[in-house]
Amino acid sequence: FGIETYFLSQHASNKQSAQTALRENEGITPLFPQQQNPVDFILNQMSHNASHRQSQELAIHFQNILKNKLNKRGRGVLQAPFVVLLEAEMPAVLVEVGFLSNRKECSEIAERSYQKQIAQALSTAILSYLPQFKKNLKKAKLRWPRE
């Protein structure tokens, strides 16, 4: 039981993370870009590396906020090859706020009041990360959308 936060990586943090990603990716076929010229490949790799670092930073941020706001055990920040995170062109994370296989958590998750707590904690995590995200955009000399 507890909260886990994942960010994309080709290699999973551990065996359990790898198994979770395999199970969650079942039936999904990722779209891979056609062969790129060397310059585009290098630019894509540079962009991916920056996004990967920022996703790790975002995952740590989410993990800390959620475990504190929801008063839950933190199970850590983990890496795994989740297809749902593959095409993100910005920092992206996958958060598990509980486990339906755990009776206590399952009944908590079913309660409307706890669902609201989860939504508020996620909202707090997102909004409190925005200044850092904007700072990262400036560092990369990119503009915030609609500014």
Regions found by a protein language model. Name each.
Residues F1-E147:
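Active-site-proximal helix/loop segments of hydrolytic enzymes
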